[in-house]
Structures are given as structure tokens and as C-alpha cells.
Amino acid sequence: MVLDFFNNLKIVINFIQYMKNYKIKNKFFKYTMNLIGNKGLGKSFLGESVKKYLVKHCKTNDIIVNGYKMFLDEKDVMHFSLFDYEPIETEIVKTNVKKNDIVVDVGANIGYYTLLMAKNHASVFSYEPEPQNFDLLKKNVILNNFSSNVKLYNKAVSNFNGYSKLVLSDHSTGQHKLEKNRFGTKSIDVEVTKLELDKIDFAKIDVEGAELLVLQGMKTLPNKMLI
């Protein structure tokens, strides 16, 4: 067991040295992140230290996630790169979203599921309230040439129209939370809307526990959902 640890340590050190001497490209960045995970180091102190080093010193402008080029927030780089991203949920979307479907992505974040839906030639309505996430969402849609069948909204979705506080998470860009009356925490004012589409074939809803409020505000419930 001790020998295995030092063998793993040697492998990681060799890759770090390589990265110090050469300009990092996407495939080397992703390969190294995968190596850490496959060697069982992902959650160890050593693994976390190496991942932090890679993110700080070996950034790429974009990486490939499940076939899509994506600009990522710094907090998301490790999460998207280390393993296949949410394989079960990904397969659900691939299986259930069909050509010409009307689909919504509520809590789109930076657009992984929006891109997945758009690839199937569906009409996608994508909602993301946090400005930095929305900026990356927009860039990722443009980067993958999906502007023609994706409509983007810099709004939160709930059971009312108006404005609310979006409480910002320090840990992850995917954990921001909508709360009407919240003080003493970092938050921003965001526009809120109800979903009033006449037809929804598929909906992906990821809003940190407020999914029921989204459903309450829908004019028509979707035929299929991923929550």
C-alpha cells in the first residue's frame, strides 16, 4: 500500500514537471485530471493539491465536455474535467429530447444541458439569473453554433413575475439560490418570471430546492422532466 502511494506520487510529480516545462493544451490538462481520478487520488490531500495547481497555473480558454467546447468558470474546471459529467442525467436528456421538441433549461448555469438539448435540434428556452454564469452560457451557445435554436434569458424562474434576491454561493456557481427575504449574505437582485409556454415537451429544472415553485408557475406542465 505504501509502495502504491509512492508510485502514484511519482507519476503525479512527473506530470507536474512536464507542465512546468511545456505550454498546456486541453488534452494534456484533461488527461492529467483523469489520471488523478483513476489512480484514486482525486479526494486525497495530494490529489486536491495537484488539481488546485493545475487550475491555477495550467488554465485553458476552453475544454471539451462530452463533445462540446465550453468556457468554464474557474470553480467548475475540476468538476467538469475530472470525470464524465453526470452520465445518468446526460443519457436521460439524449434519450428524451427529440428533433423539433420545445424544451426548457431552468437553472442553465453555463449551458451544458442547453448544448445537449440543442444538438438534438430542439427549440431550447434557457434561463440563468446569475450574470457571470449567463455570460458563459451565451458564449458557449455561440461557440457551438446553436444560436439559431436557443433562446437565452438572464432571469430566474419561479411562480411569480417580478424581482427577488439571488443568494450567491462561495463554493460553486451551480449553488446560487433564490430567496425573497435574505439579508446579511452576498446576494444580487434578479428578474424572476413564470414559464408561460403553451407547450413543453421536456424540462430540465435545477434550482437548488425550488423546483416545486417553478412547476407551480408553469402555464402547462412538461410531458417529461429531469429534476
Language-model regions, residue ranges each:
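Conserved acidic-Pro-Pro-aromatic motif
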Residues: 60, 101-102, 114, 120-122, ...
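S-adenosyl-L-methionine
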Residues: 2-192, 196
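Short, well-ordered alpha-helical scaffold segments within catalytic/effector domains
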Residues: 86-94, 185, 189-192, 212-215
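Hydrophobic packing residues within well-ordered alpha-helices of enzyme cores
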Residues: 117, 137, 150, 166, ...
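Beta-strand secondary-structure signal
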Residues: 62, 71, 163-165, 189, ...
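Short, glycine/acidic-enriched loop or turn micro-motifs at the edges of active sites
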Residues: 108-110, 131, 157-159, 207-209
